[in-house]
Amino acid sequence: LKLDLAQFRAMEAFAMFASDLDAASRAQLAKGARLVELLKQRQSAPYPVEEQVVSVWAGTTGQLDSVAVEDVRRFEVDFLDYLRREKAGLLAAIRETGKFEDSTRSGLEAAVKDFKLRFFGQGGDRLVEAGTEAAPEALDDADIDQVQIVKQR
């Protein structure tokens, strides 16, 4: 993780002066940006160690490569919630043994694959079925609050 972030910072500094970047450099910059987003936590809301392990694993093994940088934090929060609700045994295994074993890795890979289907809306349980949402209503003039600012000289 530390090496990935160091490479990202170096590439980011180089990219400021370069106009054309090859695909590998762009991919490295995107991965670094995802890692930076992944490491952000709300103040006074630390994650348990097992959740930190899962988050770092997901970021460093390319599990987040298909997630847009601006969606990484939401993906992380939702994925950890999904693990707590439906795959609690994976988190418990890390917490109780203090190890990240092959069985845990394979279970997490399957969980990420399943969760991505739900997250990106391509299967799994959806909150609202496609095509059943109500059409949005137009706002009346009375529903819109406007304030006029007048500059006096």
Task: Report each predicted region and the residues it spans.
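Conserved catalytic/coupling modules of large nucleotide/cofactor-utilizing molecular machines
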Residues: L1-R153
